[in-house]
Amino acid sequence: MSLSHLYRDGEGRIDDDDDERENFEITDWDLQNEFNPNRQRHWQTKEEATYGVWAERDSDDERPSFGGKRARDYSAPVNFISAGLKKGAAEEAELEDSDDEEKPVKQDDFPKDFGPRKLKTGGNFKPSQKGFAGGTKSFMDFGSWERHTKGIGQKLLQKMGYVPGRGLGKNAQGIINPIEAKQRKGKGAVGAYGSERTTQSMQDFPVVDSEEEAEEEFQKELSQWRKDPSGSKKKPKYSYKTVEELKAKGRISKKLTAPQKELSQVKVIDMTGREQKVYYSYSQISHKHNVPDDGLPLQSQQLPQSGKEAKAPGFALPELEHNLQLLIDLTEQEIIQNDRQLQYERDMVVNLFHELEKMTEVLDHEERVISNLSKVLEMVEECERRMQPDCSNPLTLDECARIFETLQDKYYEEYRMSDRVDLAVAIVYPLMKEYFKEWDPLKDCTYGTEIISKWKSLLENDQLLSHGGQDLSADAFHRLIWEVWMPFVRNIVTQWQPRNCDPMVDFLDSWVHIIPVWILDNILDQLIFPKLQKEVENWNPLTDTVPIHSWIHPWLPLMQARLEPLYSPIRSKLSSALQKWHPSDSSAKLILQPWKDVFTPGSWEAFMVKNIVPKLGMCLGELVINPHQQHMDAFYWVIDWEGMISVSSLVGLLEKHFFPKWLQVLCSWLSNSPNYEEITKWYLGWKSMFSDQVLAHPSVKDKFNEALDIMNRAVSSNVGAYMQPGARENIAYLTHTERRKDFQYEAMQERREAENMAQRGIGVAASSVPMNFKDLIETKAEEHNIVFMPVIGKRHEGKQLYTFGRIVIYIDRGVVFVQGEKTWVPTSLQSLIDMAK
């Protein structure tokens, strides 16, 4: 037997120390490793295929490599192999059949190139190889050789902008320290002693590798090197699905393969096969088997496979597999459907629970409503019982008001929903008629105001008030005032004399904030105004001793524009009375003066120009100007009307009838050697007769300046003649004084106008900053003597209602709204004041 195997290495090769030849005899080692799939096989290289046994081995490259074949290191010590015999083929244990059971592959069964390899250390390396093993040489003295040279490299780097101690690059982004190397502790493989990352690597790349991912990748690579993975019989892999996974799948995809109800009775004709088939639902199509056609040969039904993939089908039952898969799908769908049904039932339980809570709340509310209605019914029945004529304890108006207050406070919803009109008509109206049975409004105008105000807050419909309606059937209080209170007022107005206006005015002033607006308008338009109109027609200004303004003007705050139709006949009667009037009669001024602010400015000016100004012109025309004996009565009669007629009309009278005669007298006096001191006094005396407003008029100012010019010319023309000593100086002084007064008056007027403008600006700024809109309305009401007060217990859309004079208003975000005929209308503050006057 050959002993050549004793000189083989672990790979079954002859040492390269022997002759370059190979023995072809079969050895025990060959027999032992015949069925070993992990044995080392020699792959023929390109040179061996070309040259055969004459191919030379490459022994020049002495660097250690990671390949399976290594060059011999002749500098290493000699390693001897102990003599002995290997086990024979007879003693070889029987190989286990790897097809029966799959065993884990041990590390010894790996190819040699993939197992952990010992690193060459010590004597196993040549001297030329020791400097590269593991990169263990330190870089501590790297670049120290430049100390003994010119340092051209360092200089070039510095010229290009390199700074010692910083990294390379434009932004110094290069590394400063060299890449560190870490020496492995032992002789194991990479990763055998844990992580081999250096401190520098951990700082630059802090990402930590996942050990689970590394282990999973290792197991994946390990499974690829098992013996004969393609031909071995692997265990079948089963895919298990839990109920929770099926539920999650059903929640994600809500489409089921189960037939819908509307598609369950659809007739379907299948003509895809050789024969026509009729199905009565789409679900039957999904249950159709994919059975191959009988007419086709078996060879044409199966696609041929080539190469290693061509395998026999073995045991295959497609119908059985289809049925099993169908059962699995139906089971999954049933599980998903049951889960959805369960979720639906749970949601239904929650929904029914909420419905139960709502119905419980509704039931409690209905019980409270029934209880409240029962109590309200008891109170109404008690009132009805006490309203009977034979009742020993009859119901009074105050007690009835307290009952209604209780209904409004404690049972407001029931009180608001009930028919208050019918309730008030049945209970309150009889009591109210009994209360006002002996009432005389002109004698006791405030009688019943408190009790009516209380019933107004109890009975008045807020919704009707907010919409400005006047429907008697919808508001109990309006109907109460109209049917109970209004008859007493009609009766007393028919007996009232308009010339005795004070009692009626006081009565309406006391009730204006209580009664509805439309009822007040009815009283003024239908009852009061016809009486006044008839009395004005019967009035005669020449014979009546009572002035008409004494019984007309008290109605101005209440009626205002309603009295406009009376002004035209009054002016006509006054014009007729002034036809024979003379300015010496001062009674005309007393009669006309109260009407100056009542008539419009245009109508008043027209009345004055037509009836008064011509009379005053005639009076001035009769005036005689005599410096020695002057009679001033006619002049006083005219000037007395200064406040009644306009300044322009008065100045026109003076220009036409006074100043021509006055200047003519002055010229005549100056031409007869006058005494200039007397002329000066005469000039100043006439000027003092006019008011500052008249003197400030340009026409009057020009006339007096003309008189001064005449006096100056008279003094200057008598230069050679005899002249009173000091006359020229006196006239010059007078002229200078008068001109200075004119300038001072003009300056004072300008200063007053500037001060008034400044005061108005300050007043506007001061009033706008500290006060709100309600305070501003209150201030304006005080200035114009208008009553401004809140309406107790009345609101519109949550806003408090106020009475501004006889108008009902409310304020919303700086805007005042006035109650119109059908709705609330926004208005300005000035318009509100005009309507309230």
Curated annotation (Swiss-Prot):
- Which residues, renumbered to this chain, carry the PTM Phosphoserine? 2, 59, 98, 144, 210
Keywords recorded for this protein, A-Z? Biomineralization, Cytoplasm, mRNA processing, mRNA splicing, Nucleus, Phosphoprotein, Spliceosome
Q: Which SMART domains match?
A: G_patch (SM00443)
Q: Where are stretches of biased composition, namely Acidic residues?
A: 91-102
- Extract the ranges annotated as region (Required for interaction with DHX15): 1-50
Domain G-patch residues, every copy: 149-195
Q: What are the boundaries of the region Required for nuclear speckle localization?
A: 710-734
- Which PROSITE patterns does this UniProt record tie to the protein? G_PATCH (PS50174)
**Listed GO cellular component terms?**
catalytic step 2 spliceosome; chromosome, telomeric region; cytoplasm; extracellular matrix; nuclear speck; nucleolus; nucleoplasm; spliceosomal complex
- Region (Disordered) residue ranges read 1-21, 53-72, 85-133, 179-236
Query: Which residues lie in Basic and acidic residues bias regions?
Result: 1-13, 53-64, 103-116, 217-231
* UniProt KW Phosphoprotein keyword: yes
Q: Name the residue ranges of motif: Nuclear localization signal.
A: 700-705
- Which one of the record's GO molecular function terms can you name? nucleic acid binding
* Gene Ontology BP, a term: spliceosomal complex disassembly
Keyword Cytoplasm (UniProt): yes
Instruction: Give the UniProt subcellular location, in the record's own words.
Output: Cytoplasm; Nucleus
Give the UniProt family note.
Belongs to the TFP11/STIP family.
What this protein is reported to do is described as: Involved in pre-mRNA splicing, specifically in spliceosome disassembly during late-stage splicing events. Intron turnover seems to proceed through reactions in two lariat-intron associated complexes termed Intron Large (IL) and Intron Small (IS). In cooperation with DHX15 seems to mediate the transition of the U2, U5 and U6 snRNP-containing IL complex to the snRNP-free IS complex leading to efficient debranching and turnover of excised introns. May play a role in the differentiation of ameloblasts and odontoblasts or in the forming of the enamel extracellular matrix.
Q: How does it assemble?
A: Identified in the spliceosome C complex. Found in the Intron Large (IL) complex, a post-mRNA release spliceosomal complex containing the excised intron, U2, U5 and U6 snRNPs, and splicing factors. Interacts with TUFT1. Interacts with DHX15; indicative for a recruitment of DHX15 to the IL complex. Interacts with GCFC2.
Protein name listed in UniProt: Tuftelin-interacting protein 11
Query: What is this protein's gene name?
Result: TFIP11
